[in-house]
Amino acid sequence: MKGKITIISAICAILFGGIQANAQFRNGASFADLDDSETVRALKEHVSTISAAVMEGRKAGSEGERMTAEYVTEVFGRYGLDVLSGKDGDIFGIRQESGDTLTSRNVIAFLQGGDKALRNRYIVIGARMDNLGSDTMTIDGRTVERTYYGANGNASGLAMMLELSRMLRTNRQLLGRSVLFVAFGASCQTFAGSWYFLNRAFSDVKEIDAMINLDMVGTGSSGFY
């Protein structure tokens, strides 16, 4: 959790200081005062909700992915952002080899920059919503179902994006460029949600100055999951 706070602070420094700013923070600083902070509590709540058993691993096109999109939409709205994708998300379809269509969605929220010369330039902050879902394997002749709940992949990135949106909304008067927050559907393996955003949903791609992708930020260098 301390690592998440450091990353959030660094990203805020870059956004408030401009694209070329360098974020600086002390090594070895004490984070004890952050243990019970509002941000830490919110991060834990987001991760717990998004990686809950009811989400069933959030496989692309699943009910769990849809419920995650609904949750992200609700939080963006509660935090005071303009949700551009509507209550159902920005829905798109993916044709499968079987001929069936997989239905997924992106969630897009917006904060307008305050600089008249820069507000039509954009920084995109994104995180994928979907994970691997579940599968079955045979152990000692017994079929066992495994669910990949995805606390790190990628509930951690979504949680950080949501809290960044809250912080930037609170301090929006310091923003020069506008910021787009995008929770990508069907992007764990095929990157379909990010492709759809760039090629179908957002027309001002040339006005994007930077993109920050938040993916699997929950463990640092200590592990993969």
Annotate the PLM regions:
Residues V47, S51-K59, V72, Y79-V83, ...:
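Sec/Tat-exported extracytoplasmic proteins
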Residues R58-Q112:
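A non-catalytic alpha/beta surface segment that caps or lines the substrate-entry region
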Residues S85-G89, N120, G176-V179, D209:
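Short secondary-structure junction motifs
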Residues D100-R105, G133, T143-Y225:
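Acidic/histidine-rich catalytic neighborhood of metal-dependent amide-processing enzymes
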